[in-house]
Amino acid sequence: MFCFLGLRLLKYITFRTAYATIFAFLLALIFGPFIISRLKKLKLDQILRKDGPKRHLSEKMGIPTMGGVLIFFCVLVSLFFWIHFFNIYFLIVLFVMVSFACLGFTDDLLKIKRKNSDGLNPKFKIYGQILFSFISVVMLYYFGGEHVSILYFPFFKSLKLDLGILYIPFGMFVLISASNSFNLTDGLDGLAIGLSIVVIGALIIIAYLTSRVDFALYLNIPNVKGCEELVIFLGALLGGSFGFLWFNAYPAKIMMGDTGSLSIGAVLGMVALILKSEILFAILAGVFVVETLSVIIQVVVYKKTKKRVFKMAPLHHHFEELGWSEMQVVIRFWIIGLIFAILALSTIKIR
């Protein structure tokens, strides 16, 4: 790591974050074409839902999947140079990223092998998510700081709730929900990664404020000692995500796959847990929450009445069926995601 060079600039979180971001972005631009060509040669193409929008079957055939590999490669290489590895919060987030990426990779691989969109057995998939989330939340519970089991509520200065040992199942719920909601949203070129970039950017701000005693006291938010390394991690993830978006923007040359979406969702959920922003995260990731609710509502109502609330779920497909172009859906969802992020950040001061 560059820290051994003793350069004064490397003591500054902002400097390391900026260069971790730039480094990961440039790595994605450099290695992106190579990884895309390798995935094509290996015939690791995206398997499309047969019950999805019909035009997707012709437009998106033959596009390689497992794009999460590109993101995480760039993130890890960048972090090698810019982060202090032996930080407990970074190690927990790293475990979440790798474990959920492996689960998603297995799911993607089985879809390709079987040539259908079923992938990993849903029971095994949820068991894997439960196992990995349990391990990571237990690690956080026992090695985290003094605030670890306390929930802080936006808008209220002194409203707190100490969950005690119940924080473990609560944390597992946050991780699994975040992982699956990001996965459900990954249905259009640039949609999930663009919304993820908005969430990552907001979490960078929250992580920086939370890491500083002075800002934490002024804003009446918990000061989480040691979380400054998460700012650098999120910076690298932001750079890698921007680099991936370069190739995933319409018309996409690569898809994120479950390798990316399951892992990014879980990672951001874990970061929210560490930063004591669990409730805030629900606002921040508002588009992902709405997308998930649209699927739940569609399934529940259809089972009871045999009628559909939406033309198609998740919600982004509903708007496609209404005649919106893919780019219209994506850009409008990005705008709404940005509004949710601004709303979430504004609550930090309104207490």
UniProtKB/Swiss-Prot annotation:
Broad class of enzyme this protein falls into: transferase
GO cellular component: plasma membrane
Catalytic reaction annotation: UDP-N-acetyl-alpha-D-muramoyl-L-alanyl-gamma-D-glutamyl-meso-2,6-diaminopimeloyl-D-alanyl-D-alanine + di-trans,octa-cis-undecaprenyl phosphate = di-trans,octa-cis-undecaprenyl diphospho-N-acetyl-alpha-D-muramoyl-L-alanyl-D-glutamyl-meso-2,6-diaminopimeloyl-D-alanyl-D-alanine + UMP
Bilayer-spanning residue ranges: 17-37, 61-83, 88-105, 130-150, 158-178, 190-210, 230-250, 254-274, 279-299, 328-348
Keyword Metal-binding: yes
GO molecular function: metal ion binding; phospho-N-acetylmuramoyl-pentapeptide-transferase activity; UDP-N-acetylmuramoyl-L-alanyl-D-glutamyl-meso-2,6-diaminopimelyl-D-alanyl-D-alanine:undecaprenyl-phosphate transferase activity
EC number: 2.7.8.13
InterPro entries from the UniProt entry: Glycosyl_transferase_4, PNAcMuramoyl-5peptid_Trfase, PNAcMuramoyl-5peptid_Trfase_CS
Keyword annotations from UniProtKB, A to Z: Cell cycle, Cell division, Cell inner membrane, Cell membrane, Cell shape, Cell wall biogenesis/degradation, Magnesium, Membrane, Metal-binding, Peptidoglycan synthesis, Transferase, Transmembrane, Transmembrane helix
Similarity-based family: Belongs to the glycosyltransferase 4 family. MraY subfamily.
Stated role: Catalyzes the initial step of the lipid cycle reactions in the biosynthesis of the cell wall peptidoglycan: transfers peptidoglycan precursor phospho-MurNAc-pentapeptide from UDP-MurNAc-pentapeptide onto the lipid carrier undecaprenyl phosphate, yielding undecaprenyl-pyrophosphoryl-MurNAc-pentapeptide, known as lipid I.
HAMAP family in UniProt: MraY
NCBIfam families (UniProt xref): mraY
Name assigned to this protein: Phospho-N-acetylmuramoyl-pentapeptide-transferase
Organism: Borrelia duttonii (strain Ly)
